[in-house]
UniProtKB/Swiss-Prot annotation:
Name the record gives this protein: Cysteine--tRNA ligase
EC number: 6.1.1.16
Any one GO cellular component localisation term in the record: cytoplasm
Motif 'HIGH' region: chain residues: 30-40
Gene: cysS
Lineage: Archaea, Methanobacteriati, Methanobacteriota, Methanomada group, Methanococci
């Protein structure tokens, strides 16, 4: 039974979808005015793994990730760069999508943009005014938070304790400084759209309510985002959407933890801002994904050079196990009689697989799930060290385990995809044989060139006095 931690109730709950075997999921996308950073990467990789696991468990997932392509930050950046706001937003939408592809994050089903949903947003605001939850002023339209009785439930904030101006813009036109903007009256030189409330543009929070309702309906299963969005953004979304429909809006609220850099919160002011573009030059996508799953998605994670080296070494160990299985399959036996070593590895595979699913069913606990992966790796290594002619069936079961792990965590994909490419391996074998010939002729310069060329193709070769030259895939 799958359980997920719901920020709204602050406890783990049994996961029940509105429609059988269908998950409607909305994850807040970026405000596209700058490069994608490590915090973005952590959030979207985390929800990618959640989505992959749900799909692995037989659910059809309809995922929506929005783009906030008009906002104060975008307008400010456009002014600084002397560019049109649309040019800025389109530039960084491309950066985001490219970075997500680099991180092997599966594309969302829908990427709605705010500027393409102005009519839906206006209609949403009109209904809130009609129902008495919003009011017009000279500088826009505001949601009256006192009218919504459950305001603050998600973030556990008491309305009376809110300090005016704390993450909520102040305005003399508001009835209450805790009210938030649904529509902002246009200022000179800013992008604007016509509406019944005058020329202007949407506030930040209303966009997600309008777009999620269009694509997922008035009620859906999962709403996700970074922990920093729980207030005011998600709190305001709940108020708007529930006031609009009169229904409970979202069943499960999931939030990812912060990314720290050397023990400090990542920020531009501290000079420790790490972009996906920069870090991808140093570490492969699989190392980054493996780094993110070292901590539970709700917990903070600390990015340090030491932690990344530790992650890289552990991932290499797993890849070595997978490669050793591939090599050992060549000398395995289909009809081998099992002895205690086979029974021991079989039990490890069976128990570890069960433990993996139990961990993932407990709010997608990747930390505990990884323990199962290392248990299998240790078991396989021990088995291969004790057995000269291993069981083919057992080795294939072990490979199948790693393939399942890879599909869910977004790892090993190139290995399993390419390992079936016999033409490539035949070519590599030919190059290794050619290298052996030139080594016999003592042409070590050419031998080294072939070795380096194979490394560039993703293969590491080892000269073993007993077994001759063997090759291994380099996947990270």
């Amino acid at each position: 039974m799958l359980k997920v931690y719901n920020t709204l109730t602050r406890c783990e709950e049994e996961f029940k979808t509105l429609n059988e075997k269908e998950v409607k999921m909305y994850v807040c996308g970026p405000t596209v005015y700058d490069n994608t950073h490590l915090g973005h990467g952590r959030t979207y990789v985390s929800f990618d793994i959640i989505r992959r696991y749900l799909e692995h468990m037989g659910y059809t997932v309809n995922l929506v990730i929005n783009f906030t392509d008009i906002d104060d930050k975008i307008i400010k950046r456009a002014y600084e760069k002397e560019k049109d706001p649309k040019e800025i937003s389109e530039q960084f939408i491309k950066v985001f999508l490219d970075d997500m592809a680099t991180l092997k994050v599966k594309p969302a089903d829908i990427y709605p943009k705010v500027t393409e949903h102005i009519s839906e947003i206006i209609a949403f605001i009109e209904k809130l005014i009609e129902k008495g939850f919003a009011y017009k002023t000279e500088d826009g339209v505001y949601f009256e938070v006192k009218k919504f009785k459950n305001y603050g439930k998600l973030s556990n904030i008491n309305l009376e304790d809110l300090v005016s101006g704390a993450r909520i813009e102040t305005s003399e036109k508001k009835k209450n400084q805790k009210d938030f903007a649904l529509w902002k009256t246009a200022k000179p030189g800013e992008p604007k759209w016509e509406s019944p409330f005058g020329s202007g543009r949407p506030g930040w929070h209303i966009e997600c309510s309008a777009m999620s309702s269009k694509y997922l309906g008035e009620q859906f299963d999962i709403h996700g985002g970074g922990r920093d969005l729980s207030f005011p953004h998600h709190e305001n979304e709940i108020a708007q959407s529930s006031a609009y429909s009169g229904k409970d809006w979202v069943n499960y609220w999931l939030h990812t933890g912060f990314v720290m850099v050397n023990g400090e919160k990542m920020s531009k002011s501290l000079g420790n801002f790490v972009t996906i573009g920069d870090i991808s030059k140093e570490y492969s996508p699989e190392i980054l994904r493996f780094f993110f799953i070292q901590r539970h998605y709700r917990s903070p994670i600390d990015y340090t050079a030491e932690s990344m080296n530790h992650v890289k070494n552990n991932l290499e160990k797993i890849y070595n196990v997978i490669e050793n299985i591939r090599i050992s399959l060549e000398k395995s036996e289909k009809s081998r009689t099992w002895d205690e070593n086979e029974f021991l590895l079989y039990d490890i595979l069976k128990n570890s697989k069960n433990n993996f699913y139990n961990a993932m069913n407990s709010d997608f606990n990747t930390v505990k799930a990884l323990k199962s992966v290392f248990e299998v790796s240790n078991g396989v290594n021990k088995y291969l060290s004790l057995t000269k002619t291993p069981s083919e069936g057992l080795l294939l079961k072990a490979l199948d385990f790693y393939k399942i792990i890879g599909e869910i965590f977004g790892l090993f994909e190139n290995y399993f995809k390419e390992s079936s490419d016999s033409d490539e391996e035949e070519f590599v074998t030919f190059l290794i044989e050619l290298r052996s010939d030139v080594r016999l002729q003592k042409n070590y310069e050419m031998s080294d060139k072939i070795r380096d060329g194979l490394k560039n193709l993703g293969y590491q070769i080892e000269d073993n006095p007993k077994e001759g030259t063997v090759f291994k895939k380099i996947n990270i």
